[in-house]
Amino acid sequence: MNRIRKFFRGSGRVLAFIFVASVIWLLFDMAALRLSFSEINTRVIKEDIVRRERIGFRVQPDQGKIFYSSIKEMKPPLRGHGKGAWGKENVRKTEESVLKVEVDLDQTQRERKMQNALGRGKVVPLWHPAHLQTLPVTPNKQKTDGRGTKPEASSHQGTPKQTTAQGAPKTSFIAAKGTQVVKISVHMGRVSLKQEPRKSHSPSSDTSKLAAERDLNVTISLSTDRPKQRSQAVANERAHPASTAVPKSGEAMALNKTKTQSKEVNANKHKANTSLPFPKFTVNSNRLRKQSINETPLGSLSKDDGARGAHGKKLNFSESHLVIITKEEEQKADPKEVSNSKTKTIFPKVLGKSQSKHISRNRSEMSSSSLAPHRVPLSQTNHALTGGLEPAKINITAKAPSTEYNQSHIKALLPEDSGTHQVLRIDVTLSPRDPKAPGQFGRPVVVPHGKEKEAERRWKEGNFNVYLSDLIPVDRAIEDTRPAGCAEQLVHNNLPTTSVIMCFVDEVWSTLLRSVHSVINRSPPHLIKEILLVDDFSTKDYLKDNLDKYMSQFPKVRILRLKERHGLIRARLAGAQNATGDVLTFLDSHVECNVGWLEPLLERVYLSRKKVACPVIEVINDKDMSYMTVDNFQRGIFVWPMNFGWRTIPPDVIAKNRIKETDTIRCPVMAGGLFSIDKSYFFELGTYDPGLDVWGGENMELSFKVWMCGGEIEIIPCSRVGHIFRNDNPYSFPKDRMKTVERNLVRVAEVWLDEYKELFYGHGDHLIDQGLDVGNLTQQRELRKKLKCKSFKWYLENVFPDLRAPIVRASGVLINVALGKCISIENTTVILEDCDGSKELQQFNYTWLRLIKCGEWCIAPIPDKGAVRLHPCDNRNKGLKWLHKSTSVFHPELVNHIVFENNQQLLCLEGNFSQKILKVAACDPVKPYQKWKFEKYYEA
């Protein structure tokens, strides 16, 4: 111990302290150096990982684990391999760390993608350059919203293009013989699913041959909005990045219809991924198994809902005297299946709770590509359609033909609750469209050389180019003319069903068929209760047995035949009385419904049963049959004497109220030919006035009735229907056409215009002079009282305030220009005296019926005596009518005179101040005592 102590005496203590400090310093230095090395290694690893992520480099420690997406991206090892400042050991450790990170990344991606591959091992890219023909836009018009491209613009892109949902390109599909091509897109909130099955075929198959042999062309878009699950869906999007296995919009998938592959589909039934919050769908399995597509030239609808009454009972058409039952109708009551191996049917199997969930990772994928996919086996195609999540299994088999359309295929995708989905974009045909056919895509058609005389001769058949109409396919495609944003609008899942009512008489065959096909092809089948064709006693032979036979292929189409000519109004009433749908949708028989036309109409009626929804009526040119769009900001109006017309909303009003193209427009008067109305509300209003004859004025009557009795009329810009506008009506009238229309208008005026009916008569004075027999109005006036309808003045102030509707043409004191004196009443005579605007006996009105009246008394001439007297007012008494400010056409020099019109010689009102009396004398344009003016004048 003493020996040790001596080392710490004197200088020894210093040496010991230095030694200990050196050891401690060395330890800290070594630790710092180790930390520095570790930090450098970590930084290098991170930089290498980032660099390799950018260049697509993947280290492949095991060639058996090579993933397809990295084969073409193989790179040499890192530069400086085997070298470095830390020696071989540090380099080896660094490389092992990098390899471990890369292996983990590859393993994670492989697991994620193999999970989506339904256990089939090999993963095949889902997009591939395709040879699909895109729909063209109207000539000389380039669409910029992505809904259409020029015919020459074929899709040969190498990568799918991201677009918005509304910009999904319209694509025609090609399939091998015996293959049904189905394109179904499902949107749920912010996520989407595209299903487009195609039959597999060899790479050497001829595309043109496939186009000629395809059987079915179906385009269906479906989207549902699930607000409660939106946040969970977003979280899952972040947790599961989009995989290349998700198909893009516009892609078509091929499904082989073999027994082995059908078993493969069923074998994977239990593999549905339930990690994402999907809505649950339920459907009647027995009903679904029975439904199929009837192989007909162009399409069919379900018979189940075709002709049932409100209590689910089949409607016996023979019970109505308005209906003639054909043999085809009786046969449809008990359809029999006929064996036909060529007939294909498509129907979904039962949707299990976990299998009925449709979703994809991003809404933009819904319409991101117009490419056809590579040929894929059934199992991988099924994976592609679901993105690894199995929805309802699609079973494709060969069955006997049926007359039922698979409406539940769409309906099953909609939740049964009161949620919402995006408007369905449906365009269904059972035979392929020829893109080179005349008039295809709404293009104009030119009469072939040498056929001009025939076309001119046939013009009279329909007062439009019937020759060209017969050349155009009855199911031609037309451009989607809806404003941008309509495709994303939400509608409720539980919309009411509708009965579409078309009345016709001697309609052109091709035009009538095109109208029916446009409804069938572009309407959600679960919303169409029936299509009622009301034949108003047509005389054309082709509209009898031939029409019955043709329409027998569509179970939801019913033909009601009137036994005598009743006219459009009563024909529509017959259709309404036989309709079984919740909503009545009236259409003309020369229309073409555009995509997405029906749901926006039914949505407005669903929101309020007192709303009457009208589509935007676009133009089908009567000369070249081209489909032309119209201004989005138009509304129906009328001018006196109740002449219907269209008026564009002024730009300053649009800017001030920030009206968008997709906003509904309040419509004072509807055109009357195309609209949807709740059936029960229609009958509550008393339907059309049954006293109206044939055609004309019914749109005015129903418009006034709806607005004044608590309803609303709206134009829905997202619903578009083309209509052939003709310069003349080709249909015959039992009586004189003009008198029939005028009689109807007089009947409407007498019931609904109140005191403003004088304004109506003032613009058509001959109407009151003719003394038209308008029939008994008691029932209609009692109906107005029962409904507690508002006045026509309320209508003008609240619905149509921009209509000029002064009750009188002029009012106030009536001044003699030369004398400066005013007409006044003294006792029972008419005199001149000093003007006094506050004196009631000097206040005169010049009415629209050309009476000069003060209260109930009117100024009347006594031509024989040249005097003037007072007479009780009578609108029909021609001896009380004067012309003032309205003689400019015939006698412009007498424009400031007051002229008695009912006399062979023109007599004018003249003042005589000396005697304070009035008289009538021969008109003299330069005589100042015959010039008069009212205090105020009004225009209408």
From Swiss-Prot:
Binding sites annotated in the UniProt record for Mn(2+): 588, 590, 723
Residue ranges of domain Ricin B-type lectin in the record: 804-935
Membrane topology, as annotated: Single-pass type II membrane protein
Taxonomy, superkingdom: Eukaryota
PANTHER family: N-ACETYLGALACTOSAMINYLTRANSFERASE, POLYPEPTIDE N-ACETYLGALACTOSAMINYLTRANSFERASE 5
Pfam families: Glycos_transf_2 (PF00535), Ricin_B_lectin (PF00652)
Lumenal side: 36-940
Organism, scientific name: Homo sapiens (Human)
Gene behind this protein: GALNT5
This protein's name: Polypeptide N-acetylgalactosaminyltransferase 5
